[in-house]
């Protein structure tokens, strides 16, 4: 079952856990032209999701991902 994280501190604590395996970053452009970013952290029991609507804040959050975790970036490009 996925769990949604609302707070940045909770997300950072999940990243530091020893059972965190990988992070998938989804970058999706909406119809209004805004870019929303979702971070999905795979742990042993749950998949934790943290979404950021602000592009500048999302870049800062993406920089906090530890190097020992596998990181995969998926961007949705629509013409």
Swiss-Prot record:
<dbReference type="GO" id="GO:0003735">
    <property type="term" value="F:structural constituent of ribosome"/>
</dbReference>
<dbReference type="InterPro" id="IPR002675">
    <property type="entry name" value="Ribosomal_eL38"/>
</dbReference>
<keyword id="KW-0687">Ribonucleoprotein</keyword>
<dbReference type="Pfam" id="PF01781">
    <property type="entry name" value="Ribosomal_L38e"/>
</dbReference>
<dbReference type="GO" id="GO:0022618">
    <property type="term" value="P:protein-RNA complex assembly"/>
</dbReference>
<keyword id="KW-0689">Ribosomal protein</keyword>
<dbReference type="InterPro" id="IPR038464">
    <property type="entry name" value="Ribosomal_eL38_sf"/>
</dbReference>
<dbReference type="GO" id="GO:0006412">
    <property type="term" value="P:translation"/>
</dbReference>
<dbReference type="GO" id="GO:0022625">
    <property type="term" value="C:cytosolic large ribosomal subunit"/>
</dbReference>
<protein>
    <recommendedName>
        <fullName>Large ribosomal subunit protein eL38</fullName>
    </recommendedName>
</protein>
<comment type="similarity">
    <text>Belongs to the eukaryotic ribosomal protein eL38 family.</text>
</comment>
